Amino acid sequence: MTLPKIKHVRAWFIGGATAEKGAGGGDYHDQGGNHWIADHIATPMSKYRDYEQSRQSFGINVLGTLIVEVEAENGQTGFAVSTAGEMGCFIVEKHLNRFIEGKCVSDIKLIHDQMLGATMYYSGSGGLVMNTISCVDLALWDLFGKVVGLPVYKLLGGAVRDEIQFYATGARPDLAKEMGFIGGKMPTHWGPHDGDAGIRKDAAMVADMREKCGPDFWLMLDCWMSQDVNYATKLAHACAPFNLKWIEECLPPQQYEGYRELKRNAPAGMMVTSGEHHGTLQSFRTLSETGIDIMQPDVGWCGGLTTLVEIAALAKSRGQLVVPHGSSVYSHHAVITFTNTPFSEFLMTSPDCSTLRPQFDPILLDEPVPVNGRIHKSVLDKPGFGVELNRDCHLKRPYSH
Protein backbone atom coordinates (compact mmCIF):
# COMPACT_ATOMS: atom_id res chain seq x y z
CA MET A 1 0.00 0.00 0.00
CA THR A 2 1.42 3.37 -1.01
CA LEU A 3 0.62 5.92 1.66
CA PRO A 4 -0.12 9.53 0.68
CA LYS A 5 1.77 12.58 1.82
CA ILE A 6 0.33 15.37 3.90
CA LYS A 7 -0.79 18.22 1.69
CA HIS A 8 -1.94 20.83 4.17
CA VAL A 9 -2.40 21.66 7.84
CA ARG A 10 -4.96 24.18 9.10
CA ALA A 11 -5.74 25.55 12.55
CA TRP A 12 -8.96 27.07 13.91
CA PHE A 13 -10.14 28.12 17.33
CA ILE A 14 -13.39 28.64 19.18
CA GLY A 15 -14.05 30.35 22.50
CA GLY A 16 -11.47 31.98 24.71
CA ALA A 17 -10.90 35.65 25.47
CA THR A 18 -11.20 36.81 21.85
CA ALA A 19 -14.38 34.94 20.90
CA GLU A 20 -17.71 33.87 22.29
CA LYS A 21 -17.82 32.87 25.95
CA GLY A 22 -19.06 29.49 27.11
CA ALA A 23 -18.07 27.70 23.89
CA GLY A 24 -16.97 24.49 25.59
CA GLY A 25 -15.16 22.11 23.27
CA GLY A 26 -11.49 21.32 23.83
CA ASP A 27 -11.31 24.05 26.47
CA TYR A 28 -13.95 22.45 28.66
CA HIS A 29 -13.41 25.07 31.36
CA ASP A 30 -15.04 27.56 28.98
CA GLN A 31 -18.58 26.98 30.23
CA GLY A 32 -21.51 29.23 30.96
CA GLY A 33 -22.64 30.37 34.38
CA ASN A 34 -23.75 28.11 37.22
CA HIS A 35 -21.39 25.31 36.25
CA TRP A 36 -19.59 23.25 38.88
CA ILE A 37 -16.29 23.34 36.96
CA ALA A 38 -16.12 27.15 37.21
CA ASP A 39 -17.40 27.27 40.78
CA HIS A 40 -15.64 28.01 44.06
CA ILE A 41 -12.78 25.53 43.61
CA ALA A 42 -9.35 25.81 45.21
CA THR A 43 -6.62 26.99 42.80
CA PRO A 44 -3.16 28.58 43.08
CA MET A 45 -5.01 31.93 42.79
CA SER A 46 -7.44 31.29 45.65
CA LYS A 47 -5.11 33.03 48.10
CA TYR A 48 -6.11 36.29 46.42
CA ARG A 49 -9.60 37.24 47.51
CA ASP A 50 -10.41 38.84 44.16
CA TYR A 51 -9.95 35.47 42.42
CA GLU A 52 -11.19 32.86 44.87
CA GLN A 53 -14.91 32.70 44.08
CA SER A 54 -14.69 31.43 40.51
CA ARG A 55 -11.96 29.82 38.44
CA GLN A 56 -13.02 31.94 35.49
CA SER A 57 -12.26 35.08 37.51
CA PHE A 58 -8.51 34.54 37.06
CA GLY A 59 -8.89 33.48 33.43
CA ILE A 60 -8.93 29.68 33.35
CA ASN A 61 -10.96 29.89 30.14
CA VAL A 62 -9.03 32.58 28.23
CA LEU A 63 -7.28 30.25 25.78
CA GLY A 64 -10.23 28.54 24.13
CA THR A 65 -10.22 25.47 21.90
CA LEU A 66 -7.60 24.77 19.25
CA ILE A 67 -8.67 22.62 16.29
CA VAL A 68 -5.94 21.23 14.02
CA GLU A 69 -6.81 19.53 10.72
CA VAL A 70 -4.30 17.73 8.50
CA GLU A 71 -5.20 16.86 4.92
CA ALA A 72 -3.57 14.16 2.80
CA GLU A 73 -2.97 14.32 -0.94
CA ASN A 74 -5.90 11.98 -1.50
CA GLY A 75 -8.30 14.39 0.23
CA GLN A 76 -8.70 12.48 3.49
CA THR A 77 -8.46 14.53 6.65
CA GLY A 78 -7.68 13.97 10.29
CA PHE A 79 -8.22 16.41 13.13
CA ALA A 80 -7.96 16.88 16.87
CA VAL A 81 -8.80 19.42 19.56
CA SER A 82 -7.00 20.72 22.62
CA THR A 83 -6.67 23.84 24.76
CA ALA A 84 -4.54 26.46 23.00
CA GLY A 85 -6.95 28.73 21.15
CA GLU A 86 -5.85 31.54 18.86
CA MET A 87 -2.23 31.44 20.03
CA GLY A 88 -2.03 27.77 19.15
CA CYS A 89 -3.28 28.62 15.67
CA PHE A 90 -0.32 30.96 15.19
CA ILE A 91 2.17 28.29 16.27
CA VAL A 92 0.68 25.73 13.86
CA GLU A 93 0.29 27.98 10.83
CA LYS A 94 3.49 30.01 11.19
CA HIS A 95 5.97 27.50 12.64
CA LEU A 96 4.95 23.84 12.86
CA ASN A 97 3.50 23.64 9.34
CA ARG A 98 7.00 23.23 7.84
CA PHE A 99 7.50 19.95 9.71
CA ILE A 100 4.13 18.52 8.67
CA GLU A 101 3.41 19.31 5.04
CA GLY A 102 5.15 17.07 2.54
CA LYS A 103 5.67 14.24 5.03
CA CYS A 104 4.11 10.79 4.64
CA VAL A 105 1.01 10.30 6.78
CA SER A 106 2.91 7.61 8.70
CA ASP A 107 5.82 9.90 9.66
CA ILE A 108 4.27 10.68 13.02
CA LYS A 109 7.34 10.10 15.19
CA LEU A 110 9.58 12.10 12.87
CA ILE A 111 7.18 15.04 12.85
CA HIS A 112 6.79 14.81 16.62
CA ASP A 113 10.53 14.87 17.25
CA GLN A 114 11.02 17.80 14.90
CA MET A 115 8.22 19.80 16.54
CA LEU A 116 9.74 19.21 19.98
CA GLY A 117 13.22 20.15 18.86
CA ALA A 118 12.17 23.24 16.95
CA THR A 119 10.13 24.70 19.82
CA MET A 120 12.48 23.76 22.64
CA TYR A 121 13.82 27.28 22.99
CA TYR A 122 10.40 28.74 23.71
CA SER A 123 8.33 25.83 25.02
CA GLY A 124 9.97 24.90 28.32
CA SER A 125 8.51 21.70 29.72
CA GLY A 126 4.83 22.17 28.98
CA GLY A 127 2.07 24.72 28.64
CA LEU A 128 0.66 26.35 25.54
CA VAL A 129 3.28 25.11 23.08
CA MET A 130 3.06 21.53 24.31
CA ASN A 131 -0.74 21.69 24.09
CA THR A 132 -0.36 22.75 20.46
CA ILE A 133 2.14 20.00 19.64
CA SER A 134 -0.18 17.51 21.32
CA CYS A 135 -3.08 18.63 19.16
CA VAL A 136 -1.04 18.25 15.96
CA ASP A 137 0.15 14.82 17.06
CA LEU A 138 -3.40 13.63 17.74
CA ALA A 139 -4.57 14.96 14.37
CA LEU A 140 -1.78 13.00 12.67
CA TRP A 141 -2.81 9.77 14.40
CA ASP A 142 -6.42 10.42 13.38
CA LEU A 143 -5.40 10.92 9.75
CA PHE A 144 -3.18 7.83 9.69
CA GLY A 145 -6.00 5.70 11.08
CA LYS A 146 -8.46 7.02 8.52
CA VAL A 147 -6.04 6.46 5.62
CA VAL A 148 -5.39 2.82 6.55
CA GLY A 149 -8.97 2.21 7.70
CA LEU A 150 -8.16 1.28 11.30
CA PRO A 151 -9.03 2.71 14.72
CA VAL A 152 -6.09 4.25 16.52
CA TYR A 153 -6.11 1.61 19.26
CA LYS A 154 -5.38 -1.06 16.66
CA LEU A 155 -2.51 1.03 15.30
CA LEU A 156 -1.07 0.85 18.82
CA GLY A 157 -1.20 -2.95 18.86
CA GLY A 158 -4.78 -3.68 19.89
CA ALA A 159 -6.87 -3.84 23.04
CA VAL A 160 -5.71 -5.69 26.14
CA ARG A 161 -9.23 -5.73 27.62
CA ASP A 162 -12.78 -5.76 26.26
CA GLU A 163 -13.93 -2.55 27.91
CA ILE A 164 -12.80 0.53 29.79
CA GLN A 165 -14.28 1.18 33.23
CA PHE A 166 -14.46 4.74 34.49
CA TYR A 167 -14.58 6.86 37.56
CA ALA A 168 -16.29 10.25 37.26
CA THR A 169 -14.87 13.65 38.12
CA GLY A 170 -17.41 16.18 39.29
CA ALA A 171 -19.18 17.72 42.24
CA ARG A 172 -21.61 14.83 42.81
CA PRO A 173 -20.03 11.40 43.38
CA ASP A 174 -23.38 10.17 44.67
CA LEU A 175 -24.91 10.75 41.23
CA ALA A 176 -21.90 9.13 39.60
CA LYS A 177 -22.53 6.00 41.63
CA GLU A 178 -26.13 5.86 40.40
CA MET A 179 -24.81 6.06 36.81
CA GLY A 180 -22.60 3.00 37.27
CA PHE A 181 -19.18 4.60 37.72
CA ILE A 182 -16.64 2.88 39.98
CA GLY A 183 -15.76 6.06 41.85
CA GLY A 184 -16.12 9.80 42.12
CA LYS A 185 -13.46 12.51 42.34
CA MET A 186 -14.38 15.86 43.85
CA PRO A 187 -12.60 19.21 43.68
CA THR A 188 -11.37 20.73 46.90
CA HIS A 189 -12.72 24.16 47.79
CA TRP A 190 -10.22 25.41 50.35
CA GLY A 191 -6.47 25.84 50.66
CA PRO A 192 -3.56 26.82 52.92
CA HIS A 193 -4.80 30.41 53.19
CA ASP A 194 -7.95 29.03 54.87
CA GLY A 195 -5.96 27.20 57.55
CA ASP A 196 -7.34 24.32 59.58
CA ALA A 197 -10.89 25.52 58.95
CA GLY A 198 -10.41 24.77 55.26
CA ILE A 199 -9.20 21.27 56.05
CA ARG A 200 -12.23 20.65 58.23
CA LYS A 201 -14.62 21.85 55.51
CA ASP A 202 -13.17 19.66 52.76
CA ALA A 203 -12.94 16.67 55.10
CA ALA A 204 -16.60 17.22 56.00
CA MET A 205 -17.46 17.15 52.28
CA VAL A 206 -15.70 13.80 51.94
CA ALA A 207 -17.47 12.48 55.04
CA ASP A 208 -20.84 13.54 53.66
CA MET A 209 -20.20 11.81 50.34
CA ARG A 210 -18.97 8.68 52.09
CA GLU A 211 -22.26 8.51 53.95
CA LYS A 212 -24.23 9.00 50.71
CA CYS A 213 -22.17 6.58 48.61
CA GLY A 214 -21.57 3.77 51.08
CA PRO A 215 -18.32 2.13 52.19
CA ASP A 216 -17.07 0.60 48.95
CA PHE A 217 -17.47 3.33 46.33
CA TRP A 218 -14.18 5.06 45.53
CA LEU A 219 -13.84 8.67 46.64
CA MET A 220 -10.94 10.89 45.60
CA LEU A 221 -9.93 14.55 45.92
CA ASP A 222 -8.57 16.78 43.14
CA CYS A 223 -6.57 19.63 44.67
CA TRP A 224 -5.54 21.35 41.41
CA MET A 225 -2.06 22.58 42.45
CA SER A 226 -3.54 24.68 45.27
CA GLN A 227 -1.73 23.37 48.36
CA ASP A 228 1.64 23.07 50.06
CA VAL A 229 3.12 19.89 51.53
CA ASN A 230 2.10 20.64 55.10
CA TYR A 231 -1.51 21.44 54.24
CA ALA A 232 -1.84 18.49 51.86
CA THR A 233 -0.49 16.09 54.47
CA LYS A 234 -2.93 17.36 57.08
CA LEU A 235 -5.84 17.12 54.62
CA ALA A 236 -4.91 13.57 53.66
CA HIS A 237 -4.89 12.46 57.29
CA ALA A 238 -8.16 14.29 57.99
CA CYS A 239 -9.81 12.36 55.15
CA ALA A 240 -8.27 8.97 55.96
CA PRO A 241 -11.13 7.89 58.27
CA PHE A 242 -13.47 8.18 55.28
CA ASN A 243 -11.45 5.79 53.12
CA LEU A 244 -10.22 8.35 50.58
CA LYS A 245 -8.67 6.37 47.73
CA TRP A 246 -6.25 9.06 46.57
CA ILE A 247 -5.35 12.71 46.85
CA GLU A 248 -4.47 14.33 43.52
CA GLU A 249 -2.23 17.13 42.27
CA CYS A 250 -1.87 18.85 45.62
CA LEU A 251 1.27 20.73 44.59
CA PRO A 252 2.47 22.77 41.61
CA PRO A 253 3.95 20.59 38.85
CA GLN A 254 7.66 21.18 39.47
CA GLN A 255 7.62 20.55 43.24
CA TYR A 256 9.07 17.07 42.88
CA GLU A 257 10.65 17.02 46.34
CA GLY A 258 7.30 18.02 47.77
CA TYR A 259 5.59 15.07 46.11
CA ARG A 260 8.26 12.76 47.46
CA GLU A 261 7.66 14.09 50.97
CA LEU A 262 3.88 13.91 50.61
CA LYS A 263 4.03 10.30 49.46
CA ARG A 264 6.30 9.44 52.37
CA ASN A 265 3.94 11.01 54.93
CA ALA A 266 0.53 10.14 53.44
CA PRO A 267 -1.75 7.79 55.38
CA ALA A 268 -1.15 4.09 54.80
CA GLY A 269 -3.25 2.83 51.90
CA MET A 270 -4.00 6.29 50.46
CA MET A 271 -2.50 6.90 47.03
CA VAL A 272 -0.80 10.10 45.90
CA THR A 273 -1.30 11.03 42.24
CA SER A 274 -0.33 13.81 39.84
CA GLY A 275 0.71 14.65 36.28
CA GLU A 276 -2.18 16.49 34.65
CA HIS A 277 -0.13 19.66 34.17
CA HIS A 278 3.18 18.03 33.38
CA GLY A 279 4.46 18.04 29.82
CA THR A 280 7.29 16.09 28.12
CA LEU A 281 8.59 12.62 28.83
CA GLN A 282 11.46 14.02 30.87
CA SER A 283 9.19 15.69 33.40
CA PHE A 284 7.27 12.45 33.86
CA ARG A 285 10.50 10.55 34.44
CA THR A 286 11.32 12.95 37.27
CA LEU A 287 7.76 12.70 38.60
CA SER A 288 7.88 8.90 38.56
CA GLU A 289 11.02 8.99 40.69
CA THR A 290 9.09 10.68 43.51
CA GLY A 291 7.31 7.39 44.14
CA ILE A 292 3.76 8.61 43.54
CA ASP A 293 1.27 5.86 42.83
CA ILE A 294 -0.46 7.04 39.65
CA MET A 295 0.76 9.33 36.89
CA GLN A 296 -2.03 11.27 35.18
CA PRO A 297 -0.85 12.84 31.89
CA ASP A 298 -3.33 14.66 29.69
CA VAL A 299 -2.83 13.41 26.14
CA GLY A 300 -3.88 16.80 24.80
CA TRP A 301 -1.25 18.61 26.87
CA CYS A 302 1.70 16.27 27.51
CA GLY A 303 2.98 15.95 23.93
CA GLY A 304 0.19 13.94 22.37
CA LEU A 305 -0.39 10.23 21.91
CA THR A 306 3.22 9.70 20.90
CA THR A 307 4.40 10.98 24.28
CA LEU A 308 1.60 9.28 26.22
CA VAL A 309 2.70 5.87 24.91
CA GLU A 310 6.24 6.62 26.10
CA ILE A 311 4.99 7.71 29.53
CA ALA A 312 2.96 4.52 29.92
CA ALA A 313 6.04 2.43 29.10
CA LEU A 314 8.12 4.41 31.60
CA ALA A 315 5.51 3.93 34.32
CA LYS A 316 5.20 0.23 33.57
CA SER A 317 8.95 -0.23 33.98
CA ARG A 318 8.64 1.24 37.48
CA GLY A 319 5.50 -0.65 38.47
CA GLN A 320 3.34 2.47 38.42
CA LEU A 321 -0.12 3.04 37.02
CA VAL A 322 -0.96 5.55 34.29
CA VAL A 323 -4.50 6.91 34.39
CA PRO A 324 -4.72 9.82 31.94
CA HIS A 325 -6.54 13.00 32.78
CA GLY A 326 -9.87 13.07 30.92
CA SER A 327 -9.42 13.60 27.18
CA SER A 328 -12.27 11.40 25.95
CA VAL A 329 -11.60 9.46 22.74
CA TYR A 330 -7.98 10.59 22.65
CA SER A 331 -7.41 8.73 25.92
CA HIS A 332 -9.79 5.85 25.22
CA HIS A 333 -7.81 4.59 22.24
CA ALA A 334 -4.63 4.63 24.30
CA VAL A 335 -5.70 3.22 27.64
CA ILE A 336 -7.45 0.20 26.17
CA THR A 337 -3.98 -0.85 24.93
CA PHE A 338 -2.13 -0.20 28.24
CA THR A 339 -1.75 -3.05 30.72
CA ASN A 340 -1.03 -0.56 33.53
CA THR A 341 -4.25 1.42 33.10
CA PRO A 342 -6.99 -0.64 34.79
CA PHE A 343 -9.52 2.23 34.74
CA SER A 344 -9.89 5.72 33.29
CA GLU A 345 -11.39 9.14 34.02
CA PHE A 346 -14.63 10.59 32.70
CA LEU A 347 -15.05 14.32 33.26
CA MET A 348 -18.62 15.37 34.00
CA THR A 349 -19.25 18.48 31.89
CA SER A 350 -22.96 18.87 32.58
CA PRO A 351 -23.46 21.88 34.88
CA ASP A 352 -24.82 19.95 37.86
CA CYS A 353 -23.37 16.49 37.04
CA SER A 354 -26.87 15.05 36.69
CA THR A 355 -26.52 13.95 33.05
CA LEU A 356 -23.80 12.47 30.86
CA ARG A 357 -22.54 15.03 28.39
CA PRO A 358 -19.59 14.35 26.04
CA GLN A 359 -16.46 16.01 27.41
CA PHE A 360 -15.67 18.03 24.28
CA ASP A 361 -19.26 18.88 23.39
CA PRO A 362 -20.15 20.48 20.99
CA ILE A 363 -17.00 20.38 18.84
CA LEU A 364 -16.88 16.59 18.32
CA LEU A 365 -19.61 14.60 16.59
CA ASP A 366 -20.26 10.99 17.65
CA GLU A 367 -18.20 11.37 20.84
CA PRO A 368 -19.11 8.36 23.03
CA VAL A 369 -20.00 8.47 26.71
CA PRO A 370 -19.89 5.57 29.17
CA VAL A 371 -22.88 3.31 29.57
CA ASN A 372 -23.18 2.07 33.14
CA GLY A 373 -19.71 3.45 33.72
CA ARG A 374 -18.12 1.55 30.83
CA ILE A 375 -17.22 1.79 27.15
CA HIS A 376 -16.81 -1.43 25.15
CA LYS A 377 -13.95 -1.63 22.68
CA SER A 378 -16.41 -2.14 19.82
CA VAL A 379 -17.50 1.50 20.30
CA LEU A 380 -13.98 2.51 19.27
CA ASP A 381 -13.89 0.51 16.03
CA LYS A 382 -14.29 3.41 13.58
CA PRO A 383 -11.16 4.55 11.68
CA GLY A 384 -8.95 7.08 13.44
CA PHE A 385 -10.39 8.32 16.71
CA GLY A 386 -13.90 7.67 15.41
CA VAL A 387 -15.23 11.21 15.69
CA GLU A 388 -15.89 14.02 13.23
CA LEU A 389 -15.49 17.78 13.48
CA ASN A 390 -18.65 19.79 14.05
CA ARG A 391 -18.21 22.48 11.43
CA ASP A 392 -21.40 24.20 12.55
CA CYS A 393 -19.43 25.61 15.48
CA HIS A 394 -18.11 29.12 14.95
CA LEU A 395 -14.66 28.08 13.74
CA LYS A 396 -12.22 30.94 13.29
CA ARG A 397 -9.00 30.65 11.27
CA PRO A 398 -6.99 33.75 12.17
CA TYR A 399 -3.81 32.77 10.31
CA SER A 400 -2.90 30.97 7.10
CA HIS A 401 0.24 30.10 5.20
From Swiss-Prot:
Catalyses which reaction(s): L-rhamnonate = 2-dehydro-3-deoxy-L-rhamnonate + H2O
Site, as annotated: Increases basicity of active site His: 298
Cofactor(s) this protein cannot do without: Mg(2+)
Residues at the catalytic site: 325 (proton acceptor)
First-tier enzyme category under EC: lyase
Swiss-Prot/TrEMBL site (Transition state stabilizer) positions: 345
Family in the record: Belongs to the mandelate racemase/muconate lactonizing enzyme family. RhamD subfamily.
Other notes: Reaction proceeds via a syn dehydration.
Protein's name in the database: L-rhamnonate dehydratase
Organism: Salmonella heidelberg (strain SL476)
